[in-house]
């Protein structure tokens, strides 16, 4: 475990904020072989889970003790990608390389797999539950959004109106609708879970490529424009889109993104592989702050919120799980 205090990056070109802040980074090296944590998840008991994509494992970190446990998945080279817990403490994950969704029961170690009913849905990507316990997910290369009923294993797949848009990150609004990035286009999709109908919002710049996505308590959608180096804001009620240049510029590659309960947007710039940057954006002031990730990050692909003032990051290339404590 490595603990580092990091003040905001001091250069004017990298910091536009009324006052510097401090973030405390703590990092743990995962035991996977090879180590490559792709996505993190946080559970109410304080445990941090991750997909060990290249080692074909689901892992768990206990931050209080620094101890790890990993479960090897039954399908070889399944490429675990996204993951999310259910209300009973089971961990659901996408087998991105094997066209499946899996469920791990940590109490028993039992793993159940659900194959996609359509072979073209080859790469399930990001999973998310609704309040009724139904699991929704994106399928990137197959160009689907799907729903899995855990009660009977039934899977429904729906394609967006536009072909080959590569659905990526997905979030749920207070309305119950889901919003997802269409990474191979300048579109954000909206899924109505009752009808499985999909509406698309066209982003103003044709070269925009939204990758990860977040939503605030006002149902405003935030996304990182990976191709152009912008933070984007979409109001689905009006279809209005606003863009904010990322501090690192056009090649900053905004990726992992969350919105905390105080409406602050946090995201990671990944344009320089060994110099990833954590960015804080205040929508009220339109100001940004940045912090260099101590060990470089090596592409932070996703992050989640843990306890108040706490973010959890998966540093894929470093093989590390990181906690960013906001002071």
What is the meaning of each model-derived region?
Residues 33-45, 76-88, 119-132, 162-175, ...:
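Beta-rich, blade/repeat-based domains predominating
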Residues 26-30, 69-72, 112-116, 154-160, ...:
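A short beta-strand motif characteristic of beta-propeller blades
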Residues 298-327:
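Blade-level signature of beta-propeller repeat domains, shared across WD40, Kelch, NHL, RCC1
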Residues 1-4:
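Bacterial N-terminal signal peptides
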Residues 48-54, 91-97, 135-141, 178-184, ...:
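Conserved beta-strand positions in repeat-built beta-propeller and related beta-rich domains
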Residues 62-66, 105-109, 149-153, 192-196, ...:
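Short loop/turn segments that connect beta-strands within beta-propeller blades
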Residues 57-60, 99-103, 143-147, 187-189, ...:
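A short loop-to-beta-strand structural motif that recurs across blades of beta-propeller domains
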Residues 15-34:
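A short helix->beta-strand "capping" segment at the edge of beta-propeller domains
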């Amino acid at each position: 475990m490595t603990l580092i205090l990091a003040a905001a990056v001091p250069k004017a070109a990298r910091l536009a904020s009324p006052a510097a802040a401090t973030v405390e980074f703590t990092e743990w090296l995962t035991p996977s072989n090879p180590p490559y944590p792709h996505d993190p998840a946080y559970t109410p008991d304080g445990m941090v889970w991750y997909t060990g994509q290249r080692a074909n494992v689901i892992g768990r970190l206990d931050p209080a003790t620094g101890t790890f446990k990993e479960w090897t998945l039954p399908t070889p080279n399944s490429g675990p990608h996204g993951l999310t817990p259910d209300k009973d403490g089971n961990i659901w994950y996408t087998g991105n390389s094997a066209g499946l969704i899996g469920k791990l029961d940590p109490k028993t170690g039992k793993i159940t797999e659900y194959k996609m009913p359509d072979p073209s849905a080859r790469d399930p990507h990001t999973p998310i539950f609704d309040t009724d316990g139904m699991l929704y997910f994106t399928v990137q290369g197959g160009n689907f959004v799907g729903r899995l009923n855990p009660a009977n294993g039934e899977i429904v797949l729906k394609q967006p109106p536009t072909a080959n848009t590569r659905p990526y990150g997905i979030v749920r609004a207070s309305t119950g609708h889901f919003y997802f990035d269409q990474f191979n286009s300048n579109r954000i999709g909206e899924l109505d879970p009752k009808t499985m109908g999909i509406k698309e919002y066209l982003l103003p710049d044709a070269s925009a490529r939204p990758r990860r996505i977040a939503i605030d308590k006002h149902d405003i959608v935030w996304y990182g424009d990976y191709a152009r180096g912008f933070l984007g804001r979409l109001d689905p009620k009006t279809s209005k889109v606003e863009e904010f240049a990322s501090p690192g510029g056009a090649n900053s590659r905004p990726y992992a993104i969350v919105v905390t309960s105080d409406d602050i947007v946090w995201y990671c710039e990944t344009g320089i592989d060994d110099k990833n940057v954590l960015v804080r954006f205040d929508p009220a002031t339109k100001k940004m702050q940045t912090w260099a990730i101590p060990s470089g990050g090596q592409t932070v692909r996703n992050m989640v919120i843990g306890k108040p003032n706490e973010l959890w990051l998966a540093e894929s290339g470093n093989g590390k799980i990181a906690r960013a404590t906001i002071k």
